[in-house]
Amino acid sequence: MAKTLTIDEMHELLEELETNYHLMHSDELPELDLYMDQVVTYLWDQIGGLTRRPGEDKILTKTMINNYTKAGLLNPPDKKKYNNDHLVSLIYIYMFKNFLSISDVKAVLDPVREACFTEEEREGKAPKKGEEEKKAPLEFTKVYDVIRDSLSRGKKELEKNISEEIDSAAETFEDADPSLRPMLQQFAAVCRISADIYMKKLFLERLIDASSDSYSTTDT
């Protein structure tokens, strides 16, 4: 039988999530480049707490990394080694792919990647002999740090919003049978939070479409 959580237990679940939520600053990333197995282990250790079932769910596999590279989401490794730009890319991909399709993830990352990496870097090609080495206008890890710091500042507000949704759910079904009230209030919390997630996801999808060169609102 499914377990119903009380309002207090839902707040405790949120507090547990708050404790596990941490995105490392670029200064915390490894000083040395890593092989693929090391990348998988490192990200498991660093962001494993952000999975649905910490300690059980996989962050990524070697097959996933290869597929992301083939899809143009990840720069090819240098002599089978991955640097901090690769790690940051994988963090973005992991977070986005939970609610966006891979094609949408690519659409989101492509403009940033083009500003942070030269074409040679994105394709894993060495500069031609005698040709001056090109440099991208932005540094990928610095962009990440700005985003990461912004998320950290907004974390409390996000937590507060979820907490308020739980409290609002606690005010519903006050006249219901006491034996059914916790289940109904949990359902109300799920519906309220789901509606919020749905609207944000829909906005993201429409934002991506509106920003895509291939998207058109013209009827065919």
List where the protein language model places each region.
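Intrinsically disordered, low-complexity, charge-dense segments enriched in Lys/Arg
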Residues: V108-P111, A115-T220
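Basic helix-turn-helix/winged-helix DNA-binding cores
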Residues: A2-A115
